[in-house]
Amino acid sequence: MLGSFFFLAIISCVMSYINVDPMKSSFFLIFSLLMVMPLISFFLHVWFSYFICLLFLSGIFVILVYFSSLSKIGYVVTPFYFVGGVLSVFFFYPFFYSVTDVVAVNNFYFSVYWMLLVWVIFVLIFFMNFTSYFLNFSGALRKV
């Protein structure tokens, strides 16, 4: 059951990269958040999933405002979106079942969980690189 939620989350993330329209892309990102929430709620602290949900939704609405204000959005052909989706399934799927008691804010202070913190930073940098690539290097900031 949890695996199906994970696969739906990955599919909706891939669909958010395929769509050029900011509204559809934000919708698929919100759908991926809804599919990931059952996985995160099975970790040690349930409040952590609500915290992630609030941060993610506030970020999505900020991204939606900035992307919608862009005058032109360059369409970039993404030929390897299927390969990226399959690789992300194989890269992230074992993580959810091997680290179930680790995710808590207090656990980041101990030296045992530095690899988890490094992994989260790596995933965020990976996501930022894909986002800057699919924005066609135009940026989402307001022009002066």
From Swiss-Prot:
Family designation: Belongs to the complex I subunit 6 family.
Location within or outside the cell: Mitochondrion membrane
Known catalytic reactions: a ubiquinone + NADH + 5 H(+)(in) = a ubiquinol + NAD(+) + 4 H(+)(out)
Keyword NAD annotated: yes
Species: Ascaris suum
Role played: Core subunit of the mitochondrial membrane respiratory chain NADH dehydrogenase (Complex I) that is believed to belong to the minimal assembly required for catalysis. Complex I functions in the transfer of electrons from NADH to the respiratory chain. The immediate electron acceptor for the enzyme is believed to be ubiquinone.
Molecular-function GO terms, alphabetical: NADH dehydrogenase (ubiquinone) activity
Gene Ontology CC annotation, any one: mitochondrial membrane
Signal peptide from the UniProt entry: none
Statement: the UniProt record of this protein carries the keyword Hydrolase: no
Record protein name field: NADH-ubiquinone oxidoreductase chain 6
EC assignment: 7.1.1.2
Membrane topology (UniProt): Multi-pass membrane protein
TM spans (from-to): 1-21, 26-46, 47-67, 76-96, 108-128
Key words, A-Z: Electron transport, Membrane, Mitochondrion, NAD, Respiratory chain, Translocase, Transmembrane, Transmembrane helix, Transport, Ubiquinone
